[in-house]
Structure formats: C-alpha cells, structure tokens
From Swiss-Prot:
Residues where Mg(2+) 2 binds: D91
Function comment: Terpene cyclase that catalyzes the cyclization of farnesyl diphosphate (FPP) to delta(6)-protoilludene.
Name this polypeptide is given: Delta(6)-protoilludene synthase
GO biological process: isoprenoid biosynthetic process
Gene Ontology MF, one: acyltransferase activity
Native species: Cyclocybe aegerita
Residues binding Mg(2+) 1: D91
Reactions the enzyme catalyzes: (2E,6E)-farnesyl diphosphate = Delta(6)-protoilludene + diphosphate
Lineage: Eukaryota, Fungi, Dikarya, Basidiomycota, Agaricomycotina
InterPro entries: HMG_CoA_synth_N, Isoprenoid_synthase_dom_sf, Terpene_cyclase-like_2, Thiolase-like
Enzyme class (EC, first level): lyase
Keyword field: Lyase, Magnesium, Metal-binding
C-alpha cells in the first residue's frame, strides 16, 4: 500500500490483495454466447425499469460467471450466468425490503427450487418463475450430488439474506467475526461452488473433509474481503454499509477508512497464505476422487481470481472510472446518494413484496391478528396433540414458514400440561427454527394476545410473527398469528378490572357481570369516544349462553349506573334466548354462535378467539370492514374490555376458517 502521506479524507486506496495469486485470469470461450442467452432470459421478466436494466447489463454478471467457470462446458457456464443474474436480482430487490418481506420472497424461491417443472401461480412475485426456470435448466447439466448440494446451500444463502435484512431493520452492526459468519452465506459462494461439481460425485466424507472445509472457508473469506473492498464506496454512499467489513472494522478498531483498509488487507494476506500453504495437502482416496478433488480445489482458487478480475472490469462498483481505478487503485469517496435514487432501480410494478414495516417508523402499524384457525377436539385428542394439530394447521393453511415465527404465547385453562411447549417446539424445530420465545399463561386468554402484541411493538421485536395458542379440551382451541399490517387490529386502549376472588360457582355469574361493567367503565374513561351504536357486534367471553347480548341492559354510552343490586353485583335485563342460533336477528349473537358448536363454553382460554372466528365466518367481510368491535375477556374475577378494529379484508381468514 502507498505511504500515508497520499491519504486524504475524501479518497482511499484499494490494495492489490492478489498480486502473487497463482491462478491467472481466464475466461470461458462460450462467454459471448452465454451472455446473450442469459441476458435475454433475465430481461424478459422485467425485474428492473428500463433505466435500471441498462445499468444492470453494464455490471455484466455473465462476465463474472464466465471468469469463474472458465474451464467448464458451455451448458454449465450458461447455468452459471443465469445463477449470477439470479443472485443479483435477489440482491438488488431485497436490499430495499424489510426482513418480513424478504422472508416471504425466500419462501417463494425455495418452493420454486423444489418444483422446477411446475409453473408458478398467477400473480406471484416474478422471482418465483425466474428461480424455477433457472433450476429447470440447471438440473439438466448437474448430477444428483451437485443438485442436492446446490439446493441445500442456496436455501441457506436465502435464509442468510433474511438475517441480513433483520440486521438492517434493527440498525445492527456486527463485530468482524460475527459478520464473517453471516457473510459466508450471504455472499452466495457455496451454491456457486456446487457448479464446480456438476459432473462429480464426491462422497460426503470427502466433501466434508476438515481440510477441504477449511479451503472452502478460506476461499469464501477472500471473496468476502475482496468484494467488500470494492463495494464499500457505493454502499457507504447509499447508507447501506452496515453489512460491509470496512465499516465494521472502522467501528471495531476505532479507526478511519484507511486504518480499516490496512486491517482488512492484513486479513486477506493471512487467508491467502493459509490457502496456498495447504491446498495441495489433501489425502489420497481413489484415482477418480483424487482427480475430482484436485479439479474442485483448482476451481476454488480460480473463483478468487475471477471475483477480483470482474470487480475491476465491470461497471458494478466503479462505473465509467473502472479502467483508471484498475490501474491506479485510488478511489474518490462518493457523496451520499439522493434518497430518490435508492430504490429507483426497481420499477413500482416490480417491487414485488410490500414492506411490512417501514424502517423510519418507531414501531409497526396495525398490529393485530393476521391469521386465525380453530379446532374442535374429538374424544381421542390429548392436549399436546391438539396443540400441534392446531398450530400446524395454521402454518399450513396460510402458507407460513415456521422460520418466520419468533414467539409462542400459550394460554391454557389450567397449567396442567407443562410439556406443551416441547410438543409445539417440534413444529418449528423440524423446519430448523429453534429461535422461538415460548411463554405459558393459565386461564386468561387475552394475556397471551396482549403479550404477543406488546412484543411486536417493542424494541425486542426481530421482525417475525408471534403465535397465540389458546383453549382446552372441553371448549375447543385456536391459534392466532400476530403481526403488523393485520386485517384485525387490536386497539391499544384497555379497561381492566381486578375483582374479588370467586369462592363458588354460584358467585361466578354475578362476578362475571360485575366485571363486565366495571372493566367497560374503566375502558370508557380512557376512550370516551368509543360507541357501540355503530352497528358492530359486541363479542363477549361468556361462561354460558345466558349472559346474552351486552347491547341490552343500558350498556350504551357508558351508562353503568343503576344496575347494582344489594350484593354489589350488576343485574341484566334478560333479553337472551335459551340457546345461541345462527338465525337470531341480534348481531350480538353472531359472536357467540361458535359456542353452540362447542357446547356451552365455560371460561375457556380460547373462547374469545372461537367467538371471533364465529363473527368472521357469519358476517360478510364487506359488512365487517371498518367496524370497531368491543371484546370482553374474563377469568376468575380478572377481566379486560378492549376494542378491535377491522382494518382490512377478512375474506382470506373467513375462507380458511371454513376450510
């Protein structure tokens, strides 16, 4: 590196980390042919605006593939070109997404890889069809082992992109070691290396030999450092350098960009020395396997050279200044990019997934119930099986990736099943997700719902959903998915009443009614503008059907006076039939129809959700839209009155509840 006298605050020097690298630059002879075919394939999906497509083409990701796969057959090189284009379509679009949206995107791509011969559904984000057609062509020139390793490593790559988005959403800056651990997947090298095996059948004990594992890691780390050295200037200009080792080294080492460059250059030199000292040290197996191993390691070394050559030959990082930078290696620090340029590369029609949470907001909007499912127990169901069935059904019906769930709130009538957490754990662990907070609450179903909502709205939220499971064997169970941008929004105002303990069954009815009026009174003091005269139903968590409609009894406009009897309990003017029925004309009974299907539900932990499910299925979505609904929850004299608002279309939930 040049002397420090030449360094200034507005320019920096990129060291030549491969000056003594023994692999020379080479290019696949089918480069031009593959470039034309792959570019046409990528462009037909309209992933970018016309202006951005032109810039995308100047980056020439086909050149990167043709440098990396210089010695491979033309058909494999074409697949490599398609892969590089797919990588950078993913990179450009997910950089503008929040973590939840990236996870939705990832689910589509993974599904496409597993169904390469099945056209994607109409209206789905285009990335699904891009990934499907890529892999449909890719499997034609890759053997079974290479195919398996590609799908495994590409899936890992995609999940790491979600992690990167989570870091971005939380403005998280990792230390260098933690960053390298994540970046080894986000750089996409592992699936790229799978193409080197296109005609090989390396046994797992050879492929995962400790030395070959280290050679792969050292090669990947050199790719990371080389890429970040060249991409830093563009990324710092966009304010997107939180996932770049130069920025992280500056923070960790408390230095400026020049000090960080020295730090990273030394890291690269150490890695190169390790690779060159060990790449010929693999033990011997069979002549065929030895030949494959030698060719594979040669491919790793060539990849390091290819990435460096492409970085200084395409317009990706240095645009029209690429030849000067290649010769001199001095880079002028770019000023911050205008905000309207940060997403201009993506046309509005191609911003395929709407972000769930805008990073500029302090907390997510419209937090509530995103999805809902219920289950009626049979005589053969035990509670653990019932819980797994219901949660699994929710995930399946709404096509929810278990990895996108970060919290479980379990509400049960009695804390009689301490192993329910372990039963539910398997539904997530089988998908590779053991990073799930799990909390058990007894009796009061709204506690789980409020806890889940508070988590989503807190600084601890990591961008994933929460699931609230509630119920018991006698009344039925439910599972609710809680997250932002929900069609059923739980309003923040709550009225809570902590009454006297219930000593007997005879006291329960009076305590229930007293708690209803007291909690509603507290609610109105906090939210006086709320009115039940809007025509919306009122849902009550009712221990029996004899409690009837809470619209009656002067329970309008906060009139809770004149209803207490000599025992201090609130009496009702009975206007309720002896049983609930779907034919009743009172809208209040719509919320209690499900009670009839499950028998006379006691103070079951899941009855609020079962009543809500009844409301959604029995009232047309267009009628419910925009309505505010009062909800009352009660458990052993502890009660809460709160409101929910139907902020979106409930038709999907309605359809799935009836499925």
């Amino acid at each position: 590196m040049p002397g420090s006298a030449n360094w200034t605050a507005d320019r920096f020097y990129i060291p030549d980390t491969l000056a003594n690298w023994p692999w020379p630059r080479a290019i696949n002879p089918a480069y031009e042919e593959c470039k034309a075919a792959s570019a046409a394939w990528c462009e037909k999906y309209g992933a970018f605006s016309a202006r951005a497509q032109k810039a995308f083409n100047l980056c020439d990701f086909n050149l990167l593939a043709s440098l990396a796969y210089a010695g491979l057959p033309a058909d494999v090189n074409r697949v490599g070109c398609d892969l590089m284009n797919l990588f950078f379509v993913v990179d450009e679009h997910t950089d503008a997404m929040d973590a939840r949206s990236v996870q939705d995107w990832v689910d589509i791509v993974v599904d496409a890889l597993h169904h390469p011969h099945t056209p994607r559904p109409a209206g789905e984000p285009k990335v699904g069809e891009i990934a499907r057609t890529f892999w449909e062509n890719g499997i034609k020139c890759m053997g079974p082992t290479a195919q398996r390793r590609f799908v495994e490593t590409f899936t890992t790559y995609l999940q790491s992109v979600v992690t990167q988005a989570q870091d971005r959403d939380k403005h998280l800056f990792r230390d260098v070691d933690s960053y390298m651990e994540v970046r080894r997947d986000t750089i996409g090298a592992k699936p790229s290396f799978a193409l080197l095996e296109h005609d090989m059948e390396l046994p797992d004990d050879v492929f995962y030999h400790p030395l070959l594992e280290k050679l792969r890691e050292w090669a990947i780390d050199m790719l990371i450092l080389g890429n970040d050295l060249c991409s830093y200037n563009v990324e710092q200009s966009r304010g997107d350098d939180g996932h770049n080792i130069i920025r992280l080294a500056m923070l960790q080492e408390n230095t400026n960009v020049h000090g960080a460059l020295r730090f990273v250059s030394k890291m690269h030199d150490d890695l190169a020395e390790k690779f060159l000292s060990n790449y010929q040290g693999m033990p011997s197996f069979t002549p065929q396997i030895d030949a494959w191993v030698t060719r594979y390691i040669d491919g790793l070394g060539n990849w390091v050279r290819a990435n460096d050559s492409w970085s200084f030959e395409s317009w990706r990082y240095f645009k029209g200044d690429v030849l000067r930078v290649q010769a001199e290696r001095w880079v002028e620090l770019l000023p911050p990019a205008p905000k309207d340029e940060l997403t201009s590369s993506i046309p509005p029609e191609s911003r395929w997934i709407k972000p769930a949470v805008e990073p500029s907001r302090a907390r997510p909007n419209n937090v509530g119930i995103v999805a809902l499912d219920t289950y009626t127990p049979t005589s053969e169901d035990d509670f653990q099986t019932l819980a797994v069935k219901t949660v699994s059904s929710l995930l399946s019906k709404y096509n929810i990736n278990p990895v996108s769930v970060g919290r479980l709130d379990i509400c049960i009538e009695r804390a009689a099943d301490p192993y329910i957490i372990y039963a539910l754990r398997d539904a997530f662990a089988s998908a590779g997700n053991t990073d799930v907070e799990a909390i058990v609450s007894s009796s009061k179903s709204v506690v789980g719902l409020f806890n889940a909502i508070n988590w989503v709205e807190s600084s601890s939220w990591d961008g994933r959903y929460a699931i609230v499971f509630a119920g018991d064997l006698s009344s039925g169970v439910s599972a609710a998915l809680v997250g932002p941008d929900a069609p059923i929004v739980v309003e923040p105002t709550r009225g809570t009443y902590l009454g006297d303990p219930i000593a007997s069954t005879d006291e329960a009815q009076g305590s229930y009614i007293d708690s209803l009026f007291q909690s509603y009174s507290h609610y109105r003091k906090k939210h006086p503008q709320f009115s039940k005269t809007s025509g919306a139903p009122n849902g009550a968590h009712t221990p029996t059907t004899t409690n009837g409609s809470i619209k009656s009894n002067g329970f309008v406009s906060g009139d809770t006076n004149g209803h207490a009897n000599g025992n201090g309990h609130v009496q009702t003017r009975s206007s309720t039939p002896s049983s609930s029925s779907s034919s009743t004309s009172s809208p209040s009974f719509d919320y209690m129809i499900l009670h009839d299907r499950h028998g006379k539900i006691p103070t079951g932990a899941g009855s609020i959700y079962l009543g809500l499910a009844s409301l959604i299925t029995d009232i047309a979505p267009e009628t419910l839209a925009g309505k505010s609904i009062g909800v009352f929850g009660f458990a052993n004299s502890t009660s809460t009155f709160f409101g929910i608002r139907v902020a979106g279309d409930c038709s999907v939930i309605c359809k799935q509840l009836q499925a």
